[in-house]
């Protein structure tokens, strides 16, 4: 008796993992950078609260809208390709069969086997076969705009809440507190994203921390130069 084994791959998580990592990273860095600049100029509670909440809400909405529009464009392109493929299958099936056969030949199958595989897949689900092997669209890689938008908004809020809480609760030395907490958050984010994606941990952590430090230094310097409420 045979058991049916389904192997999960890291690439299956691409759609939501990319949007989530981007959203959390953006929320953490942008909010921390903005609060650092403001704190360096005018570190009063009311200004920090207004700045932080505005950054969180505005950033989350912006991320969701941008991600939805971007992924929707990708989805529209995929639908157009599938519509074209559906038309070709209905009007020129022999040419489509030969096209699929040639794809399998280029992948190393012998001519008879390539023709046999192409014919079997065309009989089973012709559109799915061409979508997968000719266009490169699969169930796991297909664009999902709403999923990406919600993941971006939620992860942005998750990333932005850390520097906001630190800025509002730190009684003194707000800028150093923001810097330390942001770097810790970025290191944690890099670690988690690397583990979920099956990538090396150290390069992922260094990558996000490097850009975080650059953003904090630049905005803190600008805020210090301004010396007034932003």
Where are these regions (language model features)?
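Juxtamembrane boundary at the C-terminal end of a transmembrane helix
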Residues: 220-230
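The feature identifies polytopic integral membrane transport proteins across all domains of life
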Residues: 12-23, 45-52, 113, 145-150, ...
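Cytosol/matrix-facing amphipathic helices and coiled-coil assembly/linker segments
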Residues: 1-12, 16-18, 71-153
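Internal alpha-helical transmembrane segments
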Residues: 1-70
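Interfacial loop-to-transmembrane junctions
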Residues: 188-213
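Core segments of transmembrane alpha-helices
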Residues: 27-32, 152-162
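Structural signature of hydrophobic alpha-helical transmembrane segments
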Residues: 172-185
């Amino acid at each position: 008796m045979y058991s049916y084994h389904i192997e999960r791959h890291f690439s299956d998580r691409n759609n939501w993992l990319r949007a989530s990592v981007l959203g959390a990273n953006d929320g953490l860095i942008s909010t921390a950078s903005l609060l650092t600049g403001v704190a360096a100029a005018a570190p009063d509670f009311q200004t920090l609260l207004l700045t932080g909440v505005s950054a969180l809400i505005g950033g989350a909405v912006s991320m969701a809208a941008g991600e939805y529009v971007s992924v929707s464009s990708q989805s529209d392109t995929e639908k157009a390709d599938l519509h074209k493929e559906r038309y070709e299958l209905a009007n020129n099936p022999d040419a489509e069969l030969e096209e699929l056969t040639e794809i399998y030949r280029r992948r190393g199958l012998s001519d008879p086997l390539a023709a046999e595989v192409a014919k079997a897949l065309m009989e089973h689900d012709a559109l799915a076969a061409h979508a997968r092997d000719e266009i490169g669209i699969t169930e796991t890689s297909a664009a999902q705009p709403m999923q990406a938008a919600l993941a971006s908004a939620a992860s942005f809020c998750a990333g932005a809440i850390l520097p906001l809480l630190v800025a509002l609760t730190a009684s003194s030395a707000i800028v150093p507190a923001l810097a330390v907490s942001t770097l810790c958050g970025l290191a944690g984010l890099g670690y988690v994203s690397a583990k979920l994606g099956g990538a090396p941990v150290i390069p992922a952590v260094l990558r996000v921390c490097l850009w975080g430090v650059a953003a904090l230094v630049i905005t803190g310097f600008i805020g210090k130069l301004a010396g007034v409420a932003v």
